[in-house]
Amino acid sequence: MHHQWLLLAACFWVIFMFMVASKFITLTFKDPDVYSAKQEFLFLTTMPEVRKLPEEKHIPEELKPTGKELPDSQLVQPLVYMERLELIRNVCRDDALKNLSHTPVSKFVLDRIFVCDKHKILFCQTPKVGNTQWKKVLIVLNGAFSSIEEIPENVVHDHEKNGLPRLSSFSDAEIQKRLKTYFKFFIVRDPFERLISAFKDKFVHNPRFEPWYRHEIAPGIIRKYRRNRTETRGIQFEDFVRYLGDPNHRWLDLQFGDHIIHWVTYVELCAPCEIMYSVIGHHETLEDDAPYILKEAGIDHLVSYPTIPPGITVYNRTKVEHYFLGISKRDIRRLYARFEGDFKLFGYQKPDFLLN
């Protein structure tokens, strides 16, 4: 009996010691698990939400950049140019704007496009948007002069001497081949600011010897559109606006011939809905656009765009307001109605500050 009690006591002692040891083990190793669990919970509740990236926007092959690969710092830049081309495509599809966005690829349009066969480039001329400088670039590329600085100003616009053939000078088959395979571009700026620049250049300052603007075109506009017949001043911007906004302006355009290129719409000049351009540059962002165009055309190692004077490309709303001051809302609205296609195709904001 005594031995049974001793055996029972021994078993009890072993069980007791086992319980103590288990408690010790639990106390010793529980904290790390609790900490780990707390950390895991903290991680799950405080980690920033990873937003699902939007699906990559499908860019048609013809809208993708065609030139060299850009460094990482500039990879975002081509998106701007692709968005410009996509905007044009969308506006071209808008039936409500069809009369303002479409034009036949006529000889008038082909005359505006200059060819650099050596580097497979087509440039559509849009006067009053820095075109003289782009012509100089192409003249050098064609080999007529070795540098931009060597080109005399009177040669730039003399198409018999500057070595720049017009697309219209080729056969139909050659025209189609170049339109399909060459790098094509042109430059735009705010449509109303461009008209102001054209008016100042041709009717106010007239830096080159072009007497026909003051002696033939201006009198023709005044006779037709000046309301006060007794007024003897030279052509005013108001006369110019009435002429451009007149739905029947074309009969005067025919009399003025190719001189109208300085103020007709970009649509009439370059047919952006009919010709698929590679890049559309904007005068307001020319500091970025010019190097990009040269790179995309594969000629950035051969020539540089001339230095751009500070501030010259900035949109000047004050100047626009000044020139349109005193002109009736009716005349301004008619002017906008004609150039609405240009505003929408190239993403320029509607000038409500003039229209309302």
Swiss-Prot record:
Keyword Lipid biosynthesis: no
Membrane topology (UniProt): Single-pass type II membrane protein
Enzyme class: transferase
Record keywords, A-Z: Carbohydrate metabolism, Glycoprotein, Golgi apparatus, Lipid metabolism, Membrane, Signal-anchor, Steroid metabolism, Transferase, Transmembrane, Transmembrane helix
Coiled-coil features, chain-numbered ranges: none
BP terms from Gene Ontology: androgen metabolic process; carbohydrate biosynthetic process; cell adhesion; estrogen metabolic process; learning; long-term memory; proteoglycan biosynthetic process
EC number from the UniProt entry: 2.8.2.-
Keyword Kinase applies: no
Superkingdom classification of source: Eukaryota
Effect of D190E: Induces a mild reduction in enzyme activity
Lumenal-side segments: 28-356
Molecular function (Gene Ontology), one example: HNK-1 sulfotransferase activity
Listed Pfam families: Sulfotransfer_2
One Gene Ontology term, aspect cellular component: membrane
Carbohydrate attachment residues: N99, N228, N316
Job description of the protein: Catalyzes the transfer of sulfate from 3'-phosphoadenylyl sulfate (PAPS) to position 3 of terminal glucuronic acid of both protein- and lipid-linked oligosaccharides. Participates in biosynthesis of HNK-1 carbohydrate structure 3-O-sulfo-beta-D-GlcA-(1->3)-beta-D-Gal-(1->4)-D-GlcNAc-R, a sulfated glucuronyl-lactosaminyl residue carried by many neural recognition molecules, which is involved in cell interactions during ontogenetic development and in synaptic plasticity in the adult. May be indirectly involved in synapse plasticity of the hippocampus, via its role in HNK-1 biosynthesis.
Protein's recorded name: Carbohydrate sulfotransferase 10
Native source species: Homo sapiens
